[in-house]
Structure formats: structure tokens, C-alpha cells
Amino acid sequence: MVLLKKGFAILAASFLAIGLAACSSSKNPASSDGKKVLTVSVEETYKEYIESIKTKFEKENDVTVKIVEKQMFEQLEALPLDGPAGNAPDVMLAAYDRIGGLGQQGHLLDIKPSNTKSFGDKEMQQVTVDGKVYGMPLVIETLILYYNKDLLKTAPKTFKDLEKLTEDPRFAFASEKGKSTGFLAKWTDFYMSYGLLAGYGGYVFGKNGTDSGDIGLNNKGAVEAVKYAEKWFETYWPKGMQDNSSADDFIQQMFLEGKAAAIIGGPWSAANYKEAKLNYGAAPIPTLPNGEEYAPFAGGKGWVASKYTKEPELAEKWLEYAANDANAYAFYEDTNEVPANTAARKKADEQKNELTSAVIKQYETATPTPNIPEMAEVWTGAESLIFDAASGKKSTQTSANDAVNVIKENIKEKYVK
């Protein structure tokens, strides 16, 4: 872990060195003209966008905005040490599922935004923990269906349509008789398969993802979903699809080579398909056999402020400024990442971009990823849920029960209520 590798070295650093650190927010540094300085941490790819919006903020607030380039997750992992040491930026971007833990641990500034009307309940839920708001939503993400337009005239609408692809000789897998690569999904990955489980009535935590004592990954619906996944692994897919370590590479290869007509993936994959000059389409994931919609995790990222900032008012102003209608849409124009801001999202949808529209439509059925710290135990505890059943290692119910028991035991061991 990055935090452990840093050890006590940062804590042992002299306060003089800390005070001179370029990105320090603990000493309330001033620019050469005497103005206050607000440090904004973003990845290199977002620097140009921040440059384009910071001037107006600087003029309106008589402040200098300094940009610090750092990978988002590295910045978040460093915050618990860098913050107290005075080396953290004032504001930064954070994945929604990291906000809860950092907020509860006291590393993020809880804010009282003056206007949340530009966001829906689903968006605000992802930046709120225990009734406290720790950020402003910027981007929404969820899984969608990609399909090859050279192979399919229209996007499949139902999973029955996807099953029909297995009968198409174009997608027969030469190495294994009777197997097909017509439709592929990395269901051994819990992030990818959760939409299937949720579509059948499974859930991670009760009370909108806040009750870690109520886990619904082994209820009747979840087990039914796993049984349906087993059908794909046993009847349709090559055996290699059970290998969680290599399945994604296999899926991407098949799709890029035109041997898979449709796959489930995230919006971040589109750049690779575009670069490969693949004639791809994007659409919502087809309706499940039970008539319900696939309900993948809803995620994304938002603006947050360090609890250690010496400019909390300015930091909060930046969070609202950077997430407002105009700037949220400008971010979309620059990055093609779908806005959390509802006005900006509507404008983005009007551009008739297929990928954008697919994400927006799928997001309607998506479930916010629980942002409480206990979610970390779900990722590890549920990773073998589908594999154990699909490989025949365990029965469907036993596989689900064992996964839930592992999650419960880990939560009991690591988290005290």
C-alpha cells in the first residue's frame, strides 16, 4: 500500500520543509502579488480544462489557483498522511466510492452547498455519508453494451437476443466445439456481474447501501441470477471465460477482432475502440430474462476538499463553481465524460452522441455503489461468488452463502459499530 510505504518518513519531516512545500495548504501561502492561493489537484489530462475555467474564479474571489498534477487515486491514498503534514492540495477529484471512507475518517471537509438543485438524489447520495455532504458530483459512470455495427444492424434489446447470437456460426469458438463468443461479459468480476444480481433482486447493503448488517447477495433473486450466469459459462462460453485474470483480455481481443458481436463494458473503453477504428455502437444493456433491467453500479467522481485546508470557504466555493451547469458541460466537452449536473447532462444528451446517451439511459437503472468503508470487504469477499458456481466447485446457493459469510466475517473483524 502506498500509505504504508510512506511510513513515518513524512511525519518526521521538519515543519520548516513542510512550510516551504510547493503544494502546502497548511501555511495559507500567498502568491507573489499577496493574493491567497488555492491548490487544485488533477491528473495531467485535466490540466488544460482547469486552466480554462480558473481565471473567472480567480477574478471573482481575488485568489490565485495553483494546479498540482497527480493521479487521482495516488492523491487520495496520500491524503491521510499529506494532509496532517501540510502537503495536501486544497481541493481534488475523488471517485465516489472513496468519498465515504475518507469522509468518515476525517480527511474530507464536510460542506453545506448553497445549491443542490442541479443534481438528483442519486448523485447527491454518492457524495453524502451519515447525513454529511463531502463533495460536489462531477461525472457519472456505469456499464453499458458495446456492439459491432459491422456484425449487427441494431443493438440487442433483450438477453434472448444475446442468446440467439450463440447460434450464429460467425461466432463459433474454433477451439471448443459448441462454444460461442457472440456475446461476452466478465461476470467473474463482481463489478461486472452485480447488475445481473441486482436485476434479479440482489443487493449489497440494505437501506440504500448504508446498512452493512443487511447483505442481499444470497437471497432468492441473487441466487437465480447466479444460476442464469452459470448457463452462459456452462452452455455458451469457452472455458477460459472462467479465468478472472485473463477473461478481460480475451473479451477485448474477441471484440476488436470481430469475433464477438456484443460485450458489456465501461465508457472508458470507448477510446480504445475508436483508436482501433472499430465500427462500434453503444447502447443500454439488454433486458434480463425476468423482464427486469440490468442494474449495474452507478459511479463516477466528484470534487472534494481536504479537511486540512486553511481556506475552507474558498475550497467550498471552488467545489460549487467547478460543478455548476456551465463548467460541468465544459468538462464534458473537453473529456466526453458524462456530467452529474442534470442541466449539463441534458445538454450533453442533446448532442446525440451514442456513447453519452447509452450511459445516461443505463444510469437510470444503475445503483449507486455503497460509499461506506465496509464496501471494501465486498469487493474481496464476492470476487469468487460467480466463479465458484460457474466452475462447479460449489452449488449456486453455497457459493452465494459462502461469499456473504466471508463479507460478514471481515466486516465484523475490521469495523466496530
UniProtKB/Swiss-Prot annotation:
Disulfide bonds: none annotated. It is a lipid-anchor. Inhibited by glucose and lactose. Residues 1-22 form the signal peptide. A lipid is attached at residue 23 (N-palmitoyl cysteine). The keyword Signal applies. GO terms for cellular component: ATP-binding cassette (ABC) transporter complex, substrate-binding subunit-containing. The keyword Cytoplasm does not apply. A lipid is attached at residue 23 (S-diacylglycerol cysteine). It is found in: Cell membrane. Part of the ABC transporter complex involved in maltodextrin import. Binds maltodextrin. Can also bind maltose with low affinity, but is not involved in its uptake. Maltodextrin can also be transported inside the cell after degradation to maltose by extracellular amylase AmyE, transported as maltose by MalP. The complex is composed of two ATP-binding proteins (MsmX), two transmembrane proteins (MdxF and MdxG) and a solute-binding protein (MdxE). Belongs to the bacterial solute-binding protein 1 family. This is Maltodextrin-binding protein MdxE. It comes from Bacillus subtilis (strain 168).
